[in-house]
Amino acid sequence: ANAAEAVGARIFEQSAAVSVQDGPPSLVHTAKGKLRADYVIHATNGYHSSLNPSQAAKVMPINNFLVATAPLDRPQEVLRKPIAVADNRFVLNYYRLSHDNRLIFGGGESYGARFPKDIFAKVRKPLCEIFPQLADVPLTHAWGGTLGITTRRLPLFARVGPQQLTASGYSGHGVALAGFAGQVLAETIAGNAERFDLLSQLPTPSFPGGQSLRGPIMTLAMTWFAL
């Protein structure tokens, strides 16, 4: 956001888009006004809405959670080297040490709009499965966020309309992939759509049940695979 504002972009928070009309120019309608643009980018990832129903059926929002322990007296017993680790479970766990020897641990997911009341308890269970010696170590911080996944865990690049583009469904790898997607979208708007057109050919099936029933069906499936 700071980088965008530094080159002249204006950001309007709490201004939800209620409809998008293709152009040229494209029109984005809000409750109190409208914006004109040569291109509209749908960059809502796990927050897809009725503005883009065909793509919302292909990107499932899930919530992921992390905790930080108190500084560890013997961090080398947890990780011998300063590396980040992720396992290969269907609902994966991932962790690393911070500069002040806290264990930053991510694990546990939920589906739908609600977060668990106690994120500490949600994440402590998988943490203790991997590191039982940390069962009595205090957890000092807990947080979470909503991301978007696809059925094949590959990002979704698509043309929503002649002058509407979308990139989403980074499936837990958005720190790296979202920046790359931004470059590809910028290239496309500037007139070079070669990489966008290539990536848009990646098959991205809709989730069973579409946008309305994907949540309950996905919850059952993820619970089964997590066993």
Report residues per predicted region:
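Hydrophobic/aromatic beta-strand patches that form the interior of the parallel beta-sheet core
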Residues: 12, 41, 165-167
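Active-site-proximal alpha-helical segments within enzyme catalytic domains
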Residues: 2-3, 38, 43, 185-187
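C-terminal catalytic lobe of FAD-dependent flavoproteins
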Residues: 109-226
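Hydrophobic residues embedded in beta-strands of well-ordered beta-sheets
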Residues: 26-28, 102-103, 164-165
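Helical element adjacent to the flavin cofactor pocket in flavoenzyme catalytic cores
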Residues: 1-38
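Thr-Gly-centered strand-to-loop micro-motif
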Residues: 30-31, 106-107, 167
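Active-site substrate-recognition segment that forms the wall
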Residues: 17, 34-73, 77-162
